[in-house]
Every structure is written in structure tokens, then in C-alpha cells.
Amino acid sequence: MDVFNVQELSFSLVRDQPYLSAFLLVMGSIGVGRVIYQTLSVFLQTFILPGTNLRKFGAKKGAWAVVTGATDGIGREFSLQLAKAGFHVFLVARNEALLASTAAEIEQKYGVSTATHSIDFSKADKSAYNSLGSSLGSVDVGVLVNNVGKSHAMPAYFVDTPEEEMSDIVSINVQATLQVTHSVLPGMVQRKRGLILNVGSFAGAVPSPMLATYSGTKAFLTTFSSALGEEVRKDNITVEHLNTYFVVSKLSKIRKASALIPKPDAYVRSVLSKIGLPCGASYSGRPNTSTPFWSHALLDYGLTLIGLQSAFISYTHGLHKDIRRRALRKMERDAKLQ
């Protein structure tokens, strides 16, 4: 059928089926209107609208913020910026010396109280969690930041992933989040006030080949946050899963910032200024998820709008294969120098 015949058939359908034509016009208009509305909503949330004021969760009212993985990268920035906002800060991490120095810096800069607790989440047993729970038991926790996390040493196929590495990733990314949240949640429920931030990853929203265990644990955080958020909504507690692309940190192994890869301070500022707003995660079908940093938000919304997850998975697979090749070559060069 040539182009002329197709056009002639289309015109005849419009002429002979006015109701069908009207229906198609209405449906097309609704579809276009919905995309315009959703896009404007995402832009407003990401660039203009303010999030929930932190005073709702006890800032400058004597409440504490608990931060895991609090001495480096994103966790350190959460500790500093929550202190600046008026929270006392309870820092949880493995290295006692870094805990002490970070706590001293916070007290000197912001004049708030601090407390520290050393725990290795990769090896934590029931006794270790009971000890942490006991330390947190009398604390008026307004904010919990489940930030501690671990990824693979380098991208690798699941069949080649060391068992110890798999176990550590699950212990740190999943078990630590469950246990610490379970320790502070009863107090939040009793006080009818609280904010729980679970630091996630795009690897949980879009499966990441060669980081299968890490990707699976981050997907867990997405579902856990949605379920818990619905449970405690009646108690005036906000649960937010932070969908995060790359940030300059030891975990990401990225040292240079860019428009798509912010430094920790810029990333945390975006999170704390957009509490309660899904931003780029709007219309993603992931309740209680927020993608607040502007470039991450646009990327997340773009994936939702265009629906190219399968292409993104393939791209990520290729990227991780290249990263692994370069990492192995570097290991070979280093071995020759020894």
C-alpha cells in the first residue's frame, strides 16, 4: 500500500467515523496533557518547591539525628548538615578515631551535643545490636539516616563473587538497616514524630549486571521503605528511600564531581531541602521514594517517561565489563611493580 492510499484511507476513516475520530482526538489530548502535567510537576518539585521543614522532626527542639556510616562521604555530610540544622547527632560507624574526630568537629562548629557508637556492621551479631539498641534506647530520635553501605570490590559476575563479599554486602546493606530501624522506631511511634531516610541507589531501580548482590540489596530498600512508610504513616512518621545515582565517595570510587555526579555536600543539601517531595521519582510507581538531586531527578524521570530500562541495563552491563577490565589491568601493573 503506497503513501497516497494510506492517507486516503485515513481521511475516509475521519470522514466516515466521526465518533471514532473524536475518541482518538480526546485520548491523544489526554495523553499529551498528562505528560505535560507530570513533567511540570517534576520540575516544580525538583527546582522550586521546598520540602518539609526539619523542625517537624525536632530540629532545634532537642531531638537527635542518628546517622550510620557517619564518618565519611554522604554519612559525614548528613551528620554535619543535620547538626547545622539544629539536631544533636548520634554517630554510628566502625572507626573509633574517626568517630571521635567527627564528633569533636560537629560540637565545635555547631554547638550541639554528640554521641558515638562503634560497630562493624559486617560482623555484628545479636549482642552487638543489643548494645547499640541499649545506647539508643533513651535518645529522643527525630531523624534516622540509614546510610552505611557496601558494594563489590569490582564488578563481577555473580558466579564469581566471593561468598564473604556477598555476606558482607547483605549484612551491611540489609541487616543493618533492619536492626537500627527496629531499635529507634518504637520511640518514634511513641512520640508520633520521625523521619527515616534510607540511602538507596539507581542499582535498585534498574538491575545492575555484575553487581547483582549489591543491586538486589538496594532493591530491597525500595520495597522495605514503601511498606514501612505505609505502616507508620498513621504515626506521623515519614519514611523516604533516596534513589541515588553516583556521588563522589569511597563507595563509588569516583573522585571528580560533575553535573551528574555531585559531591556529598551538594547531594545532602538537596535531600534535606526536598523532604517529602518525590522529585524525579514521581510517577515511577515507587511509593516513598525520592530522587532529589536535580540531575539524578531528570535521569530517573526520563527513564520512567521513556521506559528504556532494558537499554539502560545493557548499557550498565557494558560499563561494568569495561570497569572490571580496567581494574584487572591495574592490578596486574601493580603486581609487576612489587
From Swiss-Prot:
UniProt GO MF annotations: ketoreductase activity; very-long-chain 3-oxoacyl-CoA reductase activity
Mostly located where?
endoplasmic reticulum
Enzyme class, spelled out: oxidoreductase
* Substrates-to-products reaction catalysed: a very-long-chain (3R)-3-hydroxyacyl-CoA + NADP(+) = a very-long-chain 3-oxoacyl-CoA + NADPH + H(+)
Similarity annotation:
Belongs to the short-chain dehydrogenases/reductases (SDR) family.
Which HAMAP family has this protein been placed in? 3_ketoreductase
The protein's name is Very-long-chain 3-oxoacyl-CoA reductase
